[in-house]
From Swiss-Prot:
Belongs to the bacterial ribosomal protein bL33 family. The gene is rpmG. It holds the Pfam family Ribosomal_L33. Keywords: Ribonucleoprotein, Ribosomal protein. GO terms for molecular function: structural constituent of ribosome. GO terms for cellular component: cytosolic large ribosomal subunit. It comes from Pseudomonas syringae pv. tomato (strain ATCC BAA-871 / DC3000). This is Large ribosomal subunit protein bL33. InterPro entries: Ribosomal_bL33 (IPR001705), Ribosomal_bL33_CS (IPR018264), Ribosomal_bL33_sf (IPR038584), Ribosomal_zn-bd (IPR011332).
């Protein structure tokens, strides 16, 4: 089953992306390098829960 997740910026800007993932095939937490428009750089985004 696909579940909604929140990718939070590690730069500490508070910026986040929302996406979904298949919990059965990827049970561990996702870490992806994406663009943060606040600092205008590519930074690591870590998975967090949607509140």
């Amino acid at each position: 089953m696909r579940e909604l997740i929140r990718l939070v910026s590690s730069a500490g800007t508070g910026h986040f992306y929302t996406t979904d993932k298949n919990k059965r095939t990827t049970p561990d937490k996702i870490e992806i390098k994406k663009f943060d428009p606040v600092v205008r750089k590519h930074v690591i985004y870590k998975e967090g829960k949607i509140k």
